[in-house]
């Protein structure tokens, strides 16, 4: 454990940030799973609405620098491609 006052504060702030980041990353994983589940279920309309939510969540996480912006862009691109294929099929 830290001994200096500033190090104690830094540790406390890190714990709070970690909790916040974990919550956001969990949400990101869950919305991606929701899109994939809708695609597997064959429901293109549900997949499209889930994609809108996923896009919003991924962009917000990237804006807050919780995930890298290129990771967010890659995930959105791949999910969009999959949803578009499901709609056209």
Curated annotation (Swiss-Prot):
Top-rank taxon, per record: Bacteria
Sorted UniProt keywords: Ribonucleoprotein, Ribosomal protein, RNA-binding, rRNA-binding
MF terms in GO: small ribosomal subunit rRNA binding; structural constituent of ribosome
InterPro entries per the UniProt record, alphabetical: Ribosomal_bS20, Ribosomal_bS20_sf
Listed GO CC annotations: cytosol; small ribosomal subunit
GO biological process, one term: translation
A family per Pfam: Ribosomal_S20p
Record family assignment: Belongs to the bacterial ribosomal protein bS20 family.
Protein function: Binds directly to 16S ribosomal RNA.
Name this polypeptide is given: Small ribosomal subunit protein bS20
Name of the coding gene: rpsT
């Amino acid at each position: 454990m830290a001994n200096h006052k500033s190090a104690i504060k830094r540790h406390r702030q890190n714990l709070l940030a970690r909790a916040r980041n974990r919550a956001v990353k969990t949400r990101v994983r869950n919305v991606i799973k929701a899109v994939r589940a809708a695609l597997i279920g064959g429901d293109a309309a549900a997949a499209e609405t889930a994609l809108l939510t996923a896009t919003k969540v991924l962009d917000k996480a990237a804006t807050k620098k919780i995930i890298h912006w290129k990771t967010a862009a890659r995930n959105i691109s791949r999910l969009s491609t999959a949803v578009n294929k499901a709609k056209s099929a």
